[in-house]
Amino acid sequence: METYFGKPDENNLSDDINEAVMRSVICNIRVLLTDKDNYEARSELAWASAMAENGILKIGKVTDFQCHMIEHQLGAYTNCNHGAGLAVIHPVLYRHLLPANTARFARFAQNVWGIDPAGKSELKL
């Protein structure tokens, strides 16, 4: 998500691929919540992880992984796992970014979470 919310915000293929990867993660996590041994869902998550880490999603984007750097310190101090630490830090970052980036967050709501924009402002999305 840090790459997705990085600049530039205009449409580019990296953002489109990133949205597809995030939708796949959401879909397959939902499957695994009820069927933890589902091979297809696990393999799709592995593929999504590879896509997220191989650099293709960063092409054309300015990336900032300060949340990850902060989490490494938090994890070292508290011994929490990396994902749990990021789950605490990211919402704070996104609340900070939202006022100047409502269009990007609206796109995220629509294209990743499938939220219908009808009757909603960008900020409401």
Residues covered by each model-derived region:
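Carboxylate- and glycine-rich phosphate/diphosphate-binding segment that chelates Mg2+/Mn2+
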Residues: M1-V62
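Phenylalanine-focused residue identity feature
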Residues: F5, F65, F105-F108
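Catalytic-loop motifs flanking and including active-site residues across diverse enzymes
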Residues: I17, V21, Q66, G85-I89
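A general alpha-helix detector
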Residues: S24-N28, M51, M69-Q73, I89, ...
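Bulky hydrophobic/aromatic packing residues
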Residues: W47-A50, G55, F65-C67, L93-H96, ...
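Glycine-rich phosphate/pyrophosphate-binding beta-alpha loops
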Residues: M51-L86
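Gly/Pro-rich interdomain helix-loop hinge
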Residues: L74-L125
